[in-house]
């Protein structure tokens, strides 16, 4: 059976999970502190409903380097209106077991008031428009191309009217 079934995806996912789950006795408390307390407080403080005019949902968030979407519940609890997350790692966004889109779909089913969230493959080292992203990232799906155009515009001279209240970039700069 192994000769007839392509198992490369399974092994890739296992290898990927090992990287993300790698913790040591020294690193675990620091990781928990950073993910649990620091990130939560930043998100609640700067994206929370108290920052809006009416105190209800309202902040529009652009998340640079959203990875696997590990913070989307924090944004839900902060009561954001909408969220756009982008990351150059296609696998981190589309991983069926633990990717950002999978997490979003699961949470949207559980919580009917979960905000609208979009995820796309894009690279922050290039200008955020269709033309530059296509040249920088290269191959991408038609859906991703459409979202790129809808969210950031077709070229650097014609941007969309979409605006964001908060730019979030938690874990991207150290890479």
Where are the regions that the model predicts?
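Class I SAM-dependent methyltransferase Rossmann-like catalytic core
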Residues: 9-53
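Local beta-strand N-terminus motif with an aromatic residue
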Residues: 58, 163-164
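Short conserved loop adjoining the S-adenosyl-L-methionine
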Residues: 126-138, 143-161
